[in-house]
Regions:
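Short, flexible segments with low predicted structural confidence
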Residues: 1-3, 18, 34-36
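Short, well-ordered beta-strand segments in beta-rich or mixed alpha/beta enzyme
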Residues: 3-10, 40-67
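An amphipathic, aromatic/His-enriched active-site/gating alpha helix that lines ligand/cofactor pockets
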Residues: 25-37, 56-89
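Short, surface-exposed ligand-recognition loops at beta-strand->loop->(often short) alpha-helix junctions
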Residues: 10-21
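Short alpha-helical
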Residues: 14, 25, 48, 61, ...
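Glycine-rich beta-strand-turn "strand-cap" elements at beta-sheet edges
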Residues: 1-3, 40-49, 76-96
């Protein structure tokens, strides 16, 4: 069953475009990992600085298995654009 890893992120003032670009690039990188079922990116319709990034995985174990390789990704641009740490949690799909 697919598991989602959902992150809520806020861009620094004036960095929303940079965060969007970094998350688009991250979605492509995530899709290439074994066990990944892709990623989705949403922007809050009422707050251009607030994003939701959803990684879809075959299982929590599949996500945890790639953590060492994930840490090798160039995360500088994403981290520079963030206004604080992302809020992330695993979710199980109930209806799709």
């Amino acid at each position: 069953m697919t598991t989602a890893r959902l992150y809520i992120m806020h861009a620094k003032e004036g960095h929303d475009a940079a965060l969007e670009t970094a998350l688009r690039n991250l979605s492509e990188a995530v899709a290439a990992f074994p066990g990944s079922e892709g990623a989705e990116l949403l922007r809050d319709a009422g707050n251009e600085r607030r994003f939701v990034f959803i990684e879809k995985w075959a299982s929590i174990e599949a996500h945890e298995a790639i953590k060492a390789d994930f840490k090798k990704l160039p995360m500088g641009p994403l981290m520079d654009a963030l206004d604080g740490p992302p809020d992330g949690s695993y979710y199980d799909y109930l209806v799709r």
